[in-house]
Regions:
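Long, structured stretches of catalytic cores involved in phosphate-ester chemistry, encompassing
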Residues: 1-318
């Protein structure tokens, strides 16, 4: 029979599926856990690709960044399918035609007028190599498709055309996804939980300029959703679940063959100080406790940020 549409447009998703399949087959205790314990999840870089940055940075050319939607789709297939998401529109995968210098993407098989772009993320053009999702730093130096990059969708021009930014660099065809929004919320008793997506919309950080007012961890839409949801919450306690740490930087490498060499490493909110400090000030002014649950860093700790705001981090000790 015919391969699924996503395999035709993003064949490297099969490798991600195989990873999940292998973990569940070999990790008997892990498989038992998933069988018996209902869970909600947040994705971090290792669900996508190690040290993935700049997925929301318009014009950014990076193999890891544009693997986002392939990995996220597999994550939803195996883990996040039950997550309480704010938007349940899956990523859209298409095959586009590009002309050098043109800001128009054409796809005769698409009907962009039927897509709710407010429920979707930005557009990436795939790297286009069979090793695009392999965890190996040496591959970062290898070239991908000349049009592979992070793009802004400027406007829908018709059923088969989008205006994008930046313009294409070369004539050609390549597959692309328009990403999904993975964040959501749920309530238990008198507590509201907000599950953040800290990888899909983040701009490039700068360790040497962590206070850059334009830098964003969450993107404008998710940031506004978070503040609005908390401001209008009737709960007595707020739990904000972030895959990356809030107060402690994550700058150390785990070693091996996959060190991120294209940008100085820091996965945490410590390089997005404008957003972080705005949230702390906002939370501290509430008449309810706010607890930020974080991971990523291979350590565990508790930090009293203010009398009203705490971070509790839980990570593997290795």
């Amino acid at each position: 029979g015919q391969a699924p549409d996503i395999v035709q447009k993003a064949p490297t998703v099969v490798g991600v599926w195989e990873n999940y399949k292998t973990y569940l087959e070999r990790g008997r205790n892990l498989s038992e856990w998933h069988r018996h314990v209902p869970s909600f999840y947040t994705a971090d870089d290792h669900e996508l690709l190690n040290d993935i940055y700049g997925t929301g940075e318009v014009g950014y050319v990076n193999r890891r960044a544009v693997f986002r939607d392939i990995a996220t789709s597999a994550w939803f297939d195996y883990l996040a399918w039950a997550n309480p998401v704010e938007h349940d529109t899956p990523a859209w995968f298409g095959a586009g035609t590009f002309k050098a210098g043109s800001d128009v993407l054409a796809d005769s098989s698409a009907d962009f007028t039927k897509l709710d772009l407010n429920a979707l993320a930005n557009l990436h053009v795939h790297w286009g190599t069979s090793t695009a999702g392999v965890k190996d730093a040496k591959l970062d130096a290898e070239s991908g498709d000349p049009n592979s990059a992070v793009y802004e969708i400027v406007e829908v021009l018709g059923p088969h055309r989008l205006r994008i930014n930046p313009p294409a660099k070369a004539n050609g065809s390549q597959t692309y996804p328009i990403g999904r929004r993975c964040y959501g919320r749920f309530s238990v008793s008198n507590c509201d939980f907000f599950l953040l997506d800290t990888r899909s919309h983040r701009s490039l950080h700068n360790v040497d300029n962590p206070g850059n007012p334009k830098a964003t961890m969450l993107g404008k839409q998710q940031f506004a959703w978070l503040k609005d949801g908390i401001e209008n919450s009737k709960a007595d306690f707020i739990f904000v679940v972030s895959s990356v740490n809030f107060m402690v930087p994550h700058v150390g490498s785990g070693g091996g063959d996959d060190k991120q060499l294209t940008i100085k490493k820091d996965d945490a909110w410590t390089v997005f100080l404008r957003e972080r400090e705005e949230l702390i000030e906002f939370w501290d002014g509430l008449d309810k406790g706010v607890f930020v649950l974080t991971g990523d860093l291979h350590n565990s700790f508790a930090i009293r940020i203010t009398d009203n705001v705490w971070e509790f981090a839980s990570g593997p000790h290795n």
